[in-house]
């Protein structure tokens, strides 16, 4: 009897141990956190939104090889949704230094191409380069370790190619860096979710850099202190937020002796540079001789499979599968490919969606994105988000947007253009009409499977309601209710209304094009 009890107790301990390892290796898991969602508690009184604004960045922080642009997230819509928006402009050859945040985020590449690195705690270094270093740069290693190092080359975690139209997610606390190896500026916009349950701090988003230093950041801190002394509450709060987003080199706070003891093979000068002393380059620096071997799309799957086989050959059969599940996650999905459109109307435009179905990591981050392309004068909506807030970032063209809130009043009715962000809270109905040059935008949302409900069209809510119910709801005849219900046969994206003259003109053009 005692033997059975001991065996049962041992099995329970083993299960608990494996569960703890899984939780430790995968801290971004989707879960219903037991603690109250601090964002909803603190911001619910700030969601009484009477007016929305389409805004551009309010702060610019210059670095040696680029600019960091920050939106004012103290406006009612930003505070309500918990969104924080940042745009990075990296010049050719520029390197956005390694950093992490206390909140998950999703990035959209608006322009250019580059290389992205992701560092996941506990995952192996499955990538290697052909770089060779002289012995003096390797430190005092044994001959055996030197021979192993020279045979392997430089090893590191995964890197991948990024280009225009890519959506790149990042969990809280995971280090990422970006290098522009193209011939034009690499521009990306990032949306951080301060209300995420992954953020264990307050409603502020913080950036933590592993290198560099920002002279402008020091100036912001001095300006912040002066603002506090002058009693400017809003300006002081905005300065606090900007300082947190600009971040600082976390190594600069450690003493030289501690760092020298940790990194024993480096000299005092290197320790000083680790701490960013006298470094005025900012957090986007000009990289020197940065040659990275990046697998192209067709190679990435092969490299991943080869890495799995190598680990199996080294005896990784003892693995419980956690490494394969977590370390091989995909961190990129392109939403700018017409052939992958989820909704397409040849006369109106298209919608591409990236969510947890085609990018599984988004399930754990509770984020997703849509890329919408509208042709000349085309219309989308009215529609609303059932389970998410959204931030619309305009990438091309111009158009008119109308948003209606819960009081049945318009909270936004204006034109939008490239570079602007419009935050739309959950449930607010939106209609967008493109201008003469068309309109393109990306919608970043705080749900991994955000659902929209259109009011018009073949998949609309009105289409799903019986004609008699519509007739009584709007006090109209059943004939008019039928027309209302079935007037549009398109799905979500609608071609513009055409007069009889315009229709005849279009038919004439089609006839000549066929001839």
From Swiss-Prot:
Gene3D superfamilies, alphabetized: Jelly Rolls
Biased composition (Basic and acidic residues): 141-156, 217-239, 295-316
Segments crossing the lipid bilayer: none
Dependence of activity on temperature: Highly thermostable. Loss of stability only after incubation for 1 hour at 100 degrees Celsius.
Function comment: Seed storage protein.
GO molecular function list: IgE binding; IgG binding; nutrient reservoir activity
Ranges for region IgE-binding epitope: 23-96, 173-248, 249-320, 407-457, 440-476, 475-511
CDD domains: cupin_11S_legumin_C, cupin_11S_legumin_N
Effect of residue 362 to R: Significantly decreased IgE-binding to the wild-type epitope 347-R--N-387
Signal peptide: 1-22
Domain of life: Eukaryota
Tissue distribution of the protein: Expressed in seeds (at protein level).
Subunit structure comment from the entry: Homohexamer.
Region of interest (Disordered), residue spans: 123-156, 210-241, 295-320
Record key words, sorted: Allergen, Disulfide bond, IgE-binding protein, IgG-binding protein, Seed storage protein, Signal, Storage protein
PTM info: Proteolytically processed from a single precursor to produce an acidic and a basic chain that are linked by a disulfide bond.
Organism: Fagopyrum tataricum
UniProt protein name: 13S globulin seed storage protein
Intrachain S-S bonds: 47-80, 123-327
Biotechnology: applications noted: This protein, when mutated, can potentially be applicable to the development of transgenic hypoallergenic crops of tartarian buckwheat and specific immunotherapy to treat tartarian buckwheat allergy. Destructing the native conformation of this protein significantly reduces its allergenicity and it may be a candidate for the development of vaccine that builds immunotolerance in individuals with buckwheat allergy. Production of mosaic molecules which are reassembled derivatives of the protein may have advantages compared to production of modified fragments.
One of the Pfam families matching this protein, by short name: Cupin_1
